[in-house]
């Protein structure tokens, strides 16, 4: 019976209404203690729109944010930041699906590029970082280490025609020890 009493008190504190943020953006939806809390929609002064969950006046939980320029994020939020699993649709038709940390692509994720290229791997502050595989639309691929959005460390570049390089990379260039294997069966070690 105590549980029912707590639920009733909580249910009575939720109201449906409007809230204007200090920047002039307007929220409509569930309000608790005078702030957005629960499901609602915010229309921002710049034309952006967010529909989803709020907690204590901040985007928190699942939501969809549509930018005025046509970009869109669908996913998890934590204290007004993209945080957790989400999908971002870029205006140039790239699409990222993966983990976010404080508004950055961070952790495991996949980027589908507008030209048909695909990257599957780790991200750090919106840059490819750590281990990942980049597959070009023409069939070539790179499987290896990344740093600051560039091939860096050990990796294998396969041209998709029987030629491949296995070795060290530095800032997107072959650097250090490596082996070039030709489609003819020849091999160059250097």
Model-predicted regions and their roles:
Residues 11-49:
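N-terminal segments that cap or nucleate solenoid repeat domains
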Residues 43, 66, 88-89, 108-112, ...:
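TPR/Sel1-like alpha-solenoid repeat signature
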Residues 17, 185-190:
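Leucine-rich solenoid repeat scaffolds
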Residues 1-5:
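Bacterial N-terminal signal peptides
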Residues 7-9:
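Intrinsic low-complexity/disordered segments
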Residues 26-37, 49-60, 72-83, 95-106, ...:
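Conserved anchor residues at repeat-unit boundaries in beta-strand-based tandem repeats, strongest
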Residues 15-17, 40, 63, 86, ...:
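One face of beta-strands
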């Amino acid at each position: 019976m105590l549980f029912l009493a707590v639920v009733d008190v909580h249910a009575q504190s939720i109201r449906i209404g409007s809230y204007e943020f200090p920047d002039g953006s307007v929220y409509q939806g569930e309000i608790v203690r005078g702030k957005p809390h629960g499901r609602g929609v915010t229309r921002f002064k710049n034309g952006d729109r967010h529909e989803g969950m709020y907690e204590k006046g901040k985007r928190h939980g699942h939501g969809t944010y549509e930018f005025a320029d046509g970009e869109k994020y669908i996913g998890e939020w934590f204290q007004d930041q993209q945080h957790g699993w989400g999908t971002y649709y870029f205006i140039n038709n790239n699409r990222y699906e993966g983990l976010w940390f404080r508004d950055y692509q961070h952790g495991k994720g996949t980027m589908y590029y507008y030209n048909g290229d695909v990257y599957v791997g780790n991200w750090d502050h919106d840059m490819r970082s750590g281990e990942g595989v980049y597959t070009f639309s023409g069939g070539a691929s790179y499987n290896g280490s990344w740093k600051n959005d560039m091939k860096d460390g050990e990796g294998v570049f396969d041209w998709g025609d029987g030629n491949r390089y296995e070795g060290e990379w530095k800032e997107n260039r072959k650097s250090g020890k490596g082996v070039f294997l030709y489609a003819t069966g020849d091999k160059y070690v250097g």
